[in-house]
Structures are given as structure tokens and as C-alpha cells.
Amino acid sequence: MKNINPTQTAAWQALQKHFDEMKDVTIADLFAKDGDRFSKFSATFDDQMLVDYSKNRITEETLAKLQDLAKECDLAGAIKSMFSGEKINRTENRAVLHVALRNRSNTPILVDGKDVMPEVNAVLEKMKTFSEAIISGEWKGYTGKAITDVVNIGIGGSDLGPYMVTEALRPYKNHLNMHFVSNVDGTHIAEVLKKVNPETTLFLVASKTFTTQETMTNAHSARDWFLKAAGDEKHVAKHFAALSTNAKAVGEFGIDTANMFEFWDWVGGRYSLWSAIGLSIVLSIGFDNFVELLSGAHAMDKHFSTTPAEKNLPVLLALIGIWYNNFFGAETEAILPYDQYMHRFAAYFQQGNMESNGKYVDRNGNVVDYQTGPIIWGEPGTNGQHAFYQLIHQGTKMVPCDFIAPAITHNPLSDHHQKLLSNFFAQTEALAFGKSREVVEQEYRDQGKDPATLDYVVPFKVFEGNRPTNSILLREITPFSLGALIALYEHKIFTQGVILNIFTFDQWGVELGKQLANRILPELKDDKEISSHDSSTNGLINRYKAWRG
């Protein structure tokens, strides 16, 4: 994978000139000049997904210049490098092969000359056998009762992905109750333990090293709680399984290593739901539906790795994002799913994007002088409309938005879904075209308002429009379509990282806080006054000690 400063390319310079021509062009003008704009700036995927990017401040020339940037930065070569098992995570000397986890074609993928697919398939088969025993009730707890509740204990990628997917696919869930514990705050584990019965609960401890502070603290608390009821430590093996590679630590915890599900160093945490980390997903929706999730992602992988840039959905969305982030100065993107089951989707890709591309040093080790990853946030519609859409419509910041919705709902109650989708369609129209002063004035005249009221109120009712959006319409949210949607965003993030010349698959930014916390923890165990830090940190620690008593 080549290291190319994007700002030094001819394409970047051409884009800068093009931006000067485009910065005052409105989306309304673009639609007025081209009645065929929707068909030119939209595409379908597998008859499952329609991506409409026509309501953006772009032209065919814009996309051509952005695609030139991708070519100059050798995006095609980078894609080949990732899919072929090259160690593109250079700071950790690792391959990046979440695509192998969902490689349903089973074509060999090599790391250090070894095909990884036999091991991938072996773990999948092990997950299938284990999950079927739990779901069927064949697996019994220490008192002979079947499992009714599953508690996934993990953090970051070991929590966000499985939680998001199990929520998004709740219509496919079986009888097992799923719970997720991540925060080291004891409240999180305590509240979950109030809901479950030690006789019928299975805990999944998700930690590759089996040393993650938050996860192991919660796991030991769960073990202590369990043993208060079960008594004999031999019963731990019937109620705990591990998603890990540290067999020694897993065995010492009391877990049968036959129930340890491994994954590999080429699986990044925030791309790990496709691996053994997804065992909670399998237990929730069944193995066949999990395979459908993998198949949807694999279909998007094929699209991404074989489709030319001008028709490649992850590439197009990535390039449009760079256009706003680096030329218009937009610092944020909102992900707005109009589906309540998808309520954790934005949070999942908040980690997926910000931990991947939140870097200020390029692949050569130099501080960048351009924007890298955007701030990602969002909530489900229509809730967001009554919370933060005000700023998106009439604020001073540009917030490019992705609107996501299914055409078919899993809960066809009355006309709920039509009302939901009417809002979905209305919001992107309102953001793009706004409402002019002339229209507002005419509305007030039609209502018989007096001129003084009209003059005062009208400015507050004007919508400038020209706010960019993408609309992603799914036929229905199924395991397959969700898998494809997740992979679409994963590859968008990768594409942006390649072009921005940063390492997308490490996360050194999470380390310093952990190191300092480990240094501070012993200082909190007594009542001595602390003076070893800066005055602010000393003051906070000392007040904490005084208040805790």
C-alpha cells in the first residue's frame, strides 16, 4: 500500500479549483438544470438497497475529479493489498482480514503463505455446534435446567457490534434473552445480574487476551455472583464460555477450553462481529441467520473489490465524505436510521469511523495539514427531528447526513410505517430545497397576517436548504441486507483512510488514558493526599477521597 499525501496530488489541486466554482452552487440549481439527476446519482445493490446521492453538492465533474484522487492515491492497489492478506496495519505488523471471516466463496486467503479459511470455517462450525446445543436446550446448567439468558461481557468491538446487530435483528431472535455488559462502572453488571437467574444464565467473556481491565473486572464479578448460588467452582464451566486466544487464563478462570472460541490478530476489534465475537449474535438469531449476515457482507465485499470507482457504492460515499470534510470544512456526519431496531447503528459506526480514522499522523509518520476522520453521531428518526434537526436545518454548521430506512417494516401497525417514511422522504427534501422567504411571506399573506407580524416573523421561518444528504433505502432489514449495509460503511471508512494516507486499523489513541488509569488506581486505595500530578488532577483525586469517606 503506497503512502501518498493527497494534498500533493494533481487531483487535489484540481478539486480545490473546482470547489471555488462549486461553493455557491445550490442543490436546487443542480436539480433544476437536470431533470434526470436522480437516475445519474443513484445506484442499487443486489435489489436489496438503493443509494441515492443526488441531494449532494456535486456534479458529474465533481465525482470525476474525486475518482481521479482515488486513482492517484492508488485506492485500487490498497484494496488488493487488504483482500490478499498483506500486512497493511503496519504499526502492529498485521494483516486486516475481516473480509476472510465472511468469505462465503471459500477461495483461499493467505497470511504469511498460509490459507486462513480452514481455521475460519472450523471456528464457525464450532460456533454452530455450541449454539445449537444452547438454543435447543440440550445444554444444561448446573441444576439441570436449560439456558434462558445470555450475558455478553466485553467492551468496544467486543460489545458494540454484537449489541447493535442483535438489536437490529430482533425480529429474528429466538427465545433466549440477550444482555450486554461493557462499562467497568459496577452499576452496569449489577443491574443486569438483577434480571437473571444463575441456574439458567450463560456468560460469554469476550476478550482476546483475557486481560482487558473492564471485561475481566465484570467477568470476575459475574463469577463471584454465580458462585454465591452454585457453590462449587466446577459449575463455572457450565455457565461461562470465552471468546479469546489465551487458553491458559481461560482455563484458570474455570472455563473449559473446549468452550473457548478463538480469533486471530488479523481481526480488528471494531471489525470483529463477523468472528467468534459474534457468538452472542448466533445465540440470538441462530446460526443460519448469522450465515446470512456473513453472506450479505460478502456480497458487498465482492462489489467493493470488483466494481469500478464510478459505480462502487462504498467508494462513492467515501469520496463525497472527503469532499465535504476537506473542501467545505464540514467536521461531522450524522447517521440517521428511520428504524427503531437500528437504534445502535450510529453508535456502532461512531466507533467504527472515529477509532479508525481519528488520526493526526500520516502513514509516513508526519503530522497532517488536512482533515482526517469526521465526528460521527446520530439517533433514530423521528426522535432526532424533535431533538437536533433544528441545527441541521437552520444552524451555522454543515452536517452531511445519511438517512437510512427499510421499505418494508417488521411491525406493520396501522399506518405507522407510512408516517415514518413520509418523514424520511420529507426531511431530505426539506434539507436540500429549503423554504424561501417568498414562500413564507405568501403563506402569511394567505393566513391574513398583518404586515408588521409578517416582517418580524418571516426571517425565522426561512430554510436556506442546500444541506447535503444521502438516502439509503433498504427493501427490508434482514440479516443479509444488514450485513451488506455494515460492510458498505466499513469499506467507506477504509477508502477514506487510504486516500487520507492514515493507518485505519490501529488505535493508539486509546492507550495513554489506560496507562495513566493503571498508575492512578493504586493511589485511590488509601486516604493519603495526592500531590504527584498536575494541580487539577491532584485536586480532583483529593476531593474524591474526601467525599467518599
Swiss-Prot record:
It is found in: Cytoplasm. It catalyses: alpha-D-glucose 6-phosphate = beta-D-fructose 6-phosphate. Signal peptide: none annotated. Disruption phenotype: One of the main features of pgi mutant is the overproduction of NADPH produced in pentose phosphate (PP) pathway which causes some reducing power imbalance that ultimately affects the cell growth. Cells lacking this gene grow slowly on glucose and utilize glucose primarily via the pentose phosphate pathway as the source of NADPH. They are also hypersensitive to oxidative stress induced by paraquat. InterPro entries: G6P_Isomerase, G6P_Isomerase_C, Phosphoglucose_isomerase_CS, SIS_dom_sf, SIS_PGI_1, SIS_PGI_2. Pfam families: PGI (PF00342). The modification N6-acetyllysine is found at residues 80, 228, 234. GO terms for cellular component: cytosol. It is an enzyme of class 5 (isomerase). Its main location: cytoplasm. Its EC number is 5.3.1.9. Inhibited by sorbitol-6-phosphate (S6P) and activated by CsrA. GO terms for biological process: cellular response to oxidative stress; gluconeogenesis; glucose 6-phosphate metabolic process; glycolytic process. Pathway: Carbohydrate biosynthesis; gluconeogenesis; Carbohydrate degradation; glycolysis; D-glyceraldehyde 3-phosphate and glycerone phosphate from D-glucose: step 2/4. The active site is at 355 (proton donor), 386, 514. Keywords: Acetylation, Cytoplasm, Gluconeogenesis, Glycolysis, Isomerase. Homodimer. Catalyzes the reversible isomerization of glucose-6-phosphate to fructose-6-phosphate. This is Glucose-6-phosphate isomerase. It comes from Escherichia coli (strain K12). The lineage of its organism: Bacteria, Pseudomonadati, Pseudomonadota, Gammaproteobacteria, Enterobacterales.
